């Protein structure tokens, strides 16, 4: 008070909030970047400018200023605002000197609230989201309406209410009349009366009771309530607000429901549930968006602790404000430290929690609540388990107790899951249970683990999410012998491991994660192994195995981990898997004799694709997502620290990013022309940080100093971390769209970029794509039209390089990279879409240019590139995979991911003698980033001077021979098999032909043939292998080579790429070029000596997709527009019907029946009639199917009674051909996700195989026995049914019963002598309960395989996917090898049986020293014997 004038003196802090609306409308919060650092710190400025709107920014500015001394606020008003905001400064100064009546009323109310709540006044931290939501609700509140704040104990309900009621806008809305009552102890009529009287005294201090104190207390309550209602409806109080804190129950609420505006807080669900949404706005502080943010956690801790922000721990496992404040108090008072606070029992917190539990009456309820501590923290506890731990005290239904606990907010219910959870603050209560072992025992017994895991289904029945997440917590608390047995039974079971992985999610909520499974295996390893070395080896093998197969598992819903493990090359994994499959002798199992595993570890991105990736120190990875967010996550498989960085006001695509300043900061260039600076490691506590992130917009820095750049976009930047200048060691060079280049210096103290004093370089070059600084003196600039310019920064002169060898017309520059800088020399890598160049700076200011021989595959192009920090290797992402290019020897030394269109790469040097680099790789259309490792290769193991090899290759331990592919070569998915099935022919990326003998799986039995024509560098486009002596290949230049004789077949008709090549008989070869609509038919040997030979080869203008020889006389050609044929005896009589208007998209020819599918989904069936030396087609039926997707493949059974069609969307449908109709039997959706490339029936009609992104084996008998009703169009998936397949609506693969009304044509044709062996193998096989029709599913490593081959018995299957991985799957017949296994008992710790006769790979201990470790795309097979005996050849089939 001014004693001379008698007036109060007010500070700027008192009246600043009065001008909130004026600041929201007129003040640009980004201008705080120009404020003196003496007013706001760098961190405070970042916190303000990151706000997503003006309201949030203004509130954060005001809250920050109000936390400072008055002199700082005065400086802000009188110095900062004076520059650009004088129109704001003047009224603030006027109001400070002579405040209005409303301002004085506001200050009076605010001071009173602060005075009544001293702890709040000292330690409150404003919480933006709850503040905004509650303030808006109060501003919209009208009389007789309510606002409710609920939350668990300690969630900060009262302080949020106080903070919002201090708002000038709220005070005005309530006419500065807010009345407060704390109803914490209002549990009786006496306390109700007391609190009503207290409220009446607040409103009318002169009020005196006229009631007789001896009268009935209810009458007195009603009397005061009536008086309060009368007062609150009067004009002075019609807008007032009544705040009811800590409402305990509905009775207390009813007593104070006085028909005015009411704000109430409660932690009791009974109050929350009682108040209707029609009258009450509900705000829950338990919602994830309302909890404390990491910045708010930090601010709260700093209120209590006298320390620097960086001294706070990064990880504080709570956001409960009350718990946080008590932790901080304990540390401040020396009762705990940051290292041991989790283990210190705080008496103050215990007292608070205990007092909150006093509501539990009778005593049995407290006992039941205490027993909940038997469950692990944060678990979602199934309510069915509660009766097990309350069995001796519960006197009513479990849900009665749950509802009571929930009523007092002591548990939280998740009705959809039928589970409850315990609020985290109650976990601080240390409870000692007398019978803890018995409680754990009862939970373990509930799941009946021995019986459950002895089930005959591939998904163990009756297990819930709780079991997969927390069963180990209970197992470790039971007695030793059984504990060890059950741990092994559960955690070594591949079915359990698979379901656990599928149920888990990543820290950023991507579905499917191995992290928690790995962590639990490591944590429970002592219980599993129990000092047994054999189990130590097995657990270690599983820990190594799971990361390698994670991609296959999460990318296919129907791939079984047990099936993958049975095909693993690790000895311990295979033996354990083989032991487990003995239980399922009626299932389909394979051993693998090819190259199945590629061992690619991944980072699962969920629904996002990765656009850019950077590997950081300490096994962190930075990934720019397609959503515009940036993921920073621990990829060590040890931790799960994750930060999601985003700019909520701009989600534009990131074009480039780079880390600097010891990886503490990030620079990003966006498609909208902005460049942003990010702080990578939030020093605020808490992991999984996902809020808006601090950024500095570099464009704004330049804009504030050079107004002409206001609307210019930045198109490129260069970061120099070794500038060596006195004022800065880090410089950022930015190029604008108009060709100007500016330089910014890094301010280490303020942690931001500031414009340097170096004049702007005006290049006048538009379309700058990338540039680098060389020798600290020159710029090398490349524009979008590939113009190279060198600028001398000392004088601003330029020199356009006239390089005659620099032929990059119609190319696109991707990146420039400078390295090997010395005093006068340096090298710049120029990476373009189709080429890579090396620009060498030489002494005397001269340059030389050389092209790098990156050897791109035909038709592919470079998408991105990254050089290793040591300058040795250049990692190139291309449209066909990764290339590791050795800059020392100028040679591509390794290939990988050849099936992928690479979008981002990074290479990180490890400084390890063995493991040299980590490689990151993201691909188009993939929601994963691959993590590869490169190891060193030296001495006798090196291959053609190659010094590195992939660690992810399965063949690191394989025997290498001359037949092995080089590390930078891979198998193409172009293959054929001889009719006798004696040899498989495959083509590699060097156009060599590999002869693989399936009967002998050793690599040493592989051989290669390189036709002479390969010297022309032409690509093989088609291959045909009739027998071991008749092998032909067709090239893109139209040349057809006889591989065995290395001669070209004479023809000049086709010069275009040979797309189809098929030898239909020992003497007839058909070749076709689709693009040219040409077909050539060769007669390999003259059949009739009397027939003239001058008419061969036959040439015709038709595009042949498939050719077939019928009756030994007629060649039938299938084309896009029809079917034509010719008679070999009379080749000139070529019958070509009129072209169809619709394309033929599928066809087959079986049992003299011709099946054609058109693009309009019309199906035609014809019978072939051979008579009088003529071939005629008799139409049997024409049907339009209901499926609207495009047909991709059609196949019929050998007898023509059924056909299957695959569609481009992955759908598969089975049809019957009967009574001159094509009728739908079964439709399968959701299994294949890609276009189906091939289908094949087994001769006995028990099996159908489909090939796309995975190889699926289908039970035809099950589909036939559960076929659609005639009027039905679809059969819905039974994915969500968990019951046994023997139940009423599913008949499995048992033989069709005689009394079923089924046409005889659908009975499996298993009694034919040729088919009997196949029927024996596949009869009575079944799938699981989710997909009973699906017998097995093998996910390819690559994106797809286009074809596969099989032997006659359908026991061996061969494929090469587009990743170059060779598969040889052999059916494992358990019933033929040994009798059915005994039921699983508790004693499962038996020794492994000797399975050497079934091993997949040779032992690693016996490998040759020639193990080079080429990438799996360049690796071959290993020996593996046993299983089903080899079968006789299968007959040729014609289908498409």
UniProtKB/Swiss-Prot annotation:
NB-ARC domain location? 133-301
What InterPro entries does this protein map onto? APAF1_C, Dark_CARD, Dark_WHD, NB-ARC, P-loop_NTPase, WD40/YVTN_repeat-like_dom_sf, WD40_repeat_dom_sf, WD40_rpt
Is Cell inner membrane one of the keywords UniProt gives this record?
Answer: no
Q: Where is this region: beta-propellor 1 (8 WD repeats)?
A: 597-965
Q: Which GO terms describe its biological process?
A: apoptotic process; autophagic cell death; central nervous system formation; chaeta development; compound eye retinal cell programmed cell death; dendrite morphogenesis; melanization defense response; negative regulation of humoral immune response
Q: What ranges cover the WD repeats?
A: 649-688, 736-801, 857-895, 1186-1225, 1231-1268
Start-end of Basic residues biased regions: 1273-1283
* Posttranslational modification: May be AMPylated on Lys-251.
Provide the CARD domain boundaries.
14-92
- Pfam families hit by this protein: APAF1_C, Dark_CARD, Dark_WHD, NB-ARC
Q: Where is this region: beta-propellor 2 (7 WD repeats)?
A: 966-1373
Q: What is known of its domains?
A: Possesses an N-terminal caspase activation and recruitment domain (CARD). At high protein concentrations in vitro the CARD domain mediates the interaction of two octomeric apoptosome rings to form a double ring structure. Possesses a NB-ARC domain (nucleotide-binding adapter shared by APAF-1, certain R gene products and CED-4) that forms the inner hub of the apoptosome ring and is the main mediator of oligomerization. The interface of the NB-ARC domain and a neighboring helical region forms a binding pocket that can accommodate a nucleotide tri-phosphate with specificity for dATP. In its monomeric non-activated state the binding pocket may be associated with ADP.
Purpose: Main component of the apoptosome, an adapter protein complex that mediates activation of the caspase cascade in programmed cell death initiated by the intrinsic apoptosis pathway. Recruits the initiator caspase Dronc, promoting its autocatalytic cleavage and activation; triggers the caspase cascade upstream of the effector caspases Drice and dcp-1. Effector of reaper, grim and hid induced cell killing. Produces at least two isoforms that may activate distinct caspases by separate pathways.
Protein's recorded name: Apoptosome protein Dark
**Originating species:** Drosophila melanogaster (Fruit fly)
